[in-house]
From Swiss-Prot:
It comes from the Bacteria. Residues 1-16 have a biased composition (Basic residues). PROSITE patterns: RIBOSOMAL_L35. The gene is rpmI. GO terms for cellular component: cytosolic large ribosomal subunit. This is Large ribosomal subunit protein bL35. Belongs to the bacterial ribosomal protein bL35 family. One of its GO terms (biological process) is translation. InterPro entries: Ribosomal_bL35 (IPR001706), Ribosomal_bL35-like (IPR021137), Ribosomal_bL35_CS (IPR018265), Ribosomal_bL35_sf (IPR037229). GO terms for molecular function: structural constituent of ribosome. It comes from Bordetella pertussis (strain Tohama I / ATCC BAA-589 / NCTC 13251). Signal peptide: none annotated. Keywords: Ribonucleoprotein, Ribosomal protein.
């Protein structure tokens, strides 16, 4: 059986919290920001949790996290 490996692209995008939930960054805040309102950009700051329907696939990409 081959070695289990972490998908490095997933490891750079997700972090596992102490409670076991997975943290992700917000999308839509890299470019084309002039047409977005200040409120919209402010609400995109910070992090969010991965939805429960996607948690299993994210954990499969990071077997050692």
């Amino acid at each position: 059986m081959p070695k289990m490996k972490t998908k490095k692209s997933a490891a750079k995008r997700f972090k596992v919290r102490g409670s076991g939930s997975i943290k992700r960054g917000q999308a839509f805040k890299r470019h084309i920001l002039t047409k977005k309102t200040t409120k919209n950009k402010r609400q995109l700051r910070g992090s969010a949790a991965v939805h429960e329907t996607n948690v299993a696939s994210v954990k499969a990409m990071m077997p050692f996290a």
